[in-house]
Amino acid sequence: MFDVTPLENLFIEEYMLRAPGDFVKVYIYGLRLCYHPVEDATVPAISRALGLEEKTVLDAFAYWERVGVLRRIADNPPAYSFFNLKEAMLTGKAEG
């Protein structure tokens, strides 16, 4: 809880400013879970933590996948890999 989750300035400038607010919440919370895993990182758990409908959480992940900042790596249950945006921009490859 007292640790840090790095949020790239590139995300803020290129993606956050155009995204719906609830989708930004999902991205930042998901990024936090990448750096500080918890036992229950399911869509229902994320939904409860953020006070959002599960559909909103799933829509948010689908949105972020479409814009290219993460990718879905499993379907049941859904799991995602977040990209290093600077590396993806410099190399032209997105790797999570």
Where are these regions (language model features)?
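Winged-helix/helix-turn-helix nucleic-acid-interaction surface
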Residues: K55-G96
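Detector for short helical micro-motifs
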Residues: I12-E53
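Long, low-complexity, charged/polar intrinsically disordered regions in eukaryotic proteins
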Residues: M1-E14
